[in-house]
Amino acid sequence: QQYSFIIKRLFEFAVKDLFVINNVHSGVISANIVLPMAFRIDSENNGVKGDLPVSLLETTILDNEDLKILRNIIEEINTVLYTIIPGLRIEIKEYGSQLMDNGEEGHKIELMSSREGMPSFPIRMESEGIIKIISILNALIQAFSDPSICLAIDELDAGIFEYILGELLQIFDESAKGQLIFTSHNLRALEMLEKESIMFSTTNSSNQYIHMKNIKQSNNLRDVYLRSITLGGQKEEIYKETSSLKIARAFRRAGRCVKNNE
């Protein structure tokens, strides 16, 4: 009975409070296909959590419930978005009603970018980084304000301007109530977060994640990491050494093969 209670609580946590945003989420944005909007909407009776896909290729047809959810998402993210991207707000352009495949009435919509002093234009014309921020912003708002939320994002930095990434990480590090777990290749995170909050991947599959050792308060963690790549000094190898000469030689060989095959 005790274990069933624990399992039930874990299930409730996963359904309500756990967000996992993987590379597929980012991939459909990079391919300019779909904007998957991660969200959680709370209400008096019940809450809703999930991904609401909005097409980047054409208009999207939503039923009444999904349109209501989208309006709530846009209202929440616009509160924050214009401070991250100055002057930017998102609008829902409605083109009228259209029957859905199940025979119910749907609403044909398109997401538009609205900037001060400029005509609105389709959101697909924005950069990949801005679209990604929009897609995860509701989830970030939830994690920032709710201590029960755990938000995990694979490759948070992908497509996002380095300075904006640093600003977001600093704000979360200083003020967030929930938990943000993410992977990143961008070293900006090393300058914005406390060393205790960062783990590094290694080349040892049996001990794949470690904390850096011998880090002083005055050390720049980014410099320590780069130095550890070239000189070592950590308990595990964090980068398999490569040779720029061998890489250049391989490129030359490949170039000769291309010419010989022409």
Predicted regions and their residues:
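Phosphate-coordinating catalytic segments in nucleotide- and nucleic-acid-processing enzymes
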Residues: 1-133, 231-237, 253, 257-262
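Switch/communication elements of ASCE P-loop NTPase nucleotide-binding domains
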Residues: 73, 105-239, 257
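Conserved AAA+ ATPase small/helical "lid" subdomain
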Residues: 241-255
